[in-house]
Amino acid sequence: MSEKHPGPLVVEGKLTDAERMKLESNYLRGTIAEDLNDGLTGGFKGDNFLLIRFHGMYQQDDRDIRAERAEQKLEPRHAMLLRCRLPGGVITTKQWQAIDKFAGENTIYGSIRLTNRQTFQFHGILKKNVKPVHQMLHSVGLDALATANDMNRNVLCTSNPYESQLHAEAYEWAKKISEHLLPRTRAYAEIWLDQEKVATTDEEPILGQTYLPRKFKTTVVIPPQNDIDLHANDMNFVAIAENGKLVGFNLLVGGGLSIEHGNKKTYARTASEFGYLPLEHTLAVAEAVVTTQRDWGNRTDRKNAKTKYTLERVGVETFKAEVERRAGIKFEPIRPYEFTGRGDRIGWVKGIDDNWHLTLFIENGRILDYPARPLKTGLLEIAKIHKGDFRITANQNLIIAGVPESEKAKIEKIAKESGLMNAVTPQRENSMACVSFPTCPLAMAEAERFLPSFIDNIDNLMAKHGVSDEHIVMRVTGCPNGCGRAMLAEVGLVGKAPGRYNLHLGGNRIGTRIPRMYKENITEPEILASLDELIGRWAKEREAGEGFGDFTVRAGIIRPVLDPARDLWD
């Protein structure tokens, strides 16, 4: 489809100010170190406001009290969000205990937020605690480097507790890819870890002096689970196994979900299949994809800078041929693979290594001690006795991994007493939201705070129509940037204004089809009225095993998105 619309390999024109900022930053140093010592403001100023993102942080403020503080002639209550680099979501219990302590003692909100990028975030870090958080992470072998802005972000890997050997191999590749694509600048170590400046010239052989044109996301996925939502990502390595052993990857490039309301030059896009590669070429191919996007990505318009737009501009075959040239390989034909689901298997699963794995449902990934549900304390107690590790899933849940039979009852007791194993409906298990208000500066409508009561209402509709044992993949994102991955849901709500959302329908359960907007700028009662009617029809008219999204397409309720670059907005 893309070959009909070839365009220039490099977009000429005035570069965005972000490109100026990166070029002048002295390899991401800026004046962050000096800004840290400025006690007159709780935030970072000028270019540093954006540069700290390369160091894994976003400057935010509490939007619930923004107007009140403005009336009092006070600056916004600035605080940082920090996102950890955690390839594949694996974290040791020692590391967990350290982040639990920091969250409780040094953040405004006191919580740990699991994200659908398979890592954790701290919200509400005051400026005085910014350096200590990086030093705490370093002390337990973690960092926040390259988890935001124009770099390869946290690398995802399917959380598959059953196929323990295959997961271990895939996870190792996720770590290798993450390390290979990290920036080489010593700015992070100098600013946060007080490491000495080395008298050598900085070089960025892969990312370049101005880094990537836009954010870049990578996954390693183990079929038949598509829990990491590969089509939301720029570069995806689909594991191909023979006799339970990893032999190579299918490569898919150019997925991405972010759009802008009303801007038809923006669109969500599923990733394109490039071909199969043996394991030994993995890092060379990863580097070739990244450097091709580095050189060809649009640096004149950040809203059109991601890999998906580059593919559509130059053509899939042209981009693929350049990757082959740079990597020195020829892709083999795609090997067969299929996806059957995206959800986590909540509860106990026994692995082929005879260890047990307990997947805990964490609503919206928010770990905090609630009345009668001390989730944070419960997980801390488990971390103190568990000999295995924890694994954060791309569905914002947590796996207590590698539990021997002898420890199973002890861990289950703590989990149950802490409310970590409370029964939830299949619908709630398969619903997700981004953070949105009060901390996200881009939020247009509620998401995390909206979802629990919204799902109460959806559960009532499911019961009304006799489908309580079923689920619809349902997601809410507070703005069209799409962190909640609503643009791969069967039912996606995209925030438009306070209390109002665009309702998207027609995605599928396995995450391989983009949903289309069904109704625009509507309220929760209007959303529920529409879904009441549609769930009722699905319950009565569906075919055997037919998911809600597939039904809405087959029944003619919504047209499927076949070529999102050209028909998403039709």
Curated annotation (Swiss-Prot):
The keyword Transferase does not apply. Keywords: 4Fe-4S, Amino-acid biosynthesis, Cysteine biosynthesis, Heme, Iron, Iron-sulfur, Metal-binding, NADP, Oxidoreductase. Pfam families: NIR_SIR (PF01077), NIR_SIR_ferr (PF03460). It catalyses: hydrogen sulfide + 3 NADP(+) + 3 H2O = sulfite + 3 NADPH + 4 H(+). Its cofactor is siroheme; [4Fe-4S] cluster. Pathway: Sulfur metabolism; hydrogen sulfide biosynthesis; hydrogen sulfide from sulfite (NADPH route): step 1/1. One of its GO terms (cellular component) is sulfite reductase complex (NADPH). Its EC number is 1.8.1.2. Siroheme binds at C483. [4Fe-4S] cluster binds at C434, C440, C479, C483. GO terms for biological process: cysteine biosynthetic process; hydrogen sulfide biosynthetic process; sulfate assimilation. Disulfide bonds: none annotated. One of its GO terms (molecular function) is metal ion binding. InterPro entries: CysI (IPR011786), NiRdtase/SiRdtase_haem-b_fer (IPR005117), Nit/Sulf_reduc_fer-like_dom_sf (IPR036136), NO2/SO3_Rdtase_4Fe4S_dom (IPR006067), NO2/SO3_Rdtase_4Fe4S_prot (IPR045169), NO2/SO3_Rdtase_4Fe4S_sf (IPR045854), NO2/SO3_Rdtase_FeS/sirohaem_BS (IPR006066). The keyword Cytoplasm does not apply. Alpha(8)-beta(8). The alpha component is a flavoprotein, the beta component is a hemoprotein. Belongs to the nitrite and sulfite reductase 4Fe-4S domain family. Component of the sulfite reductase complex that catalyzes the 6-electron reduction of sulfite to sulfide. This is one of several activities required for the biosynthesis of L-cysteine from sulfate. This is Sulfite reductase [NADPH] hemoprotein beta-component. The lineage of its organism: Bacteria, Pseudomonadati, Pseudomonadota, Gammaproteobacteria, Enterobacterales. The gene is cysI.
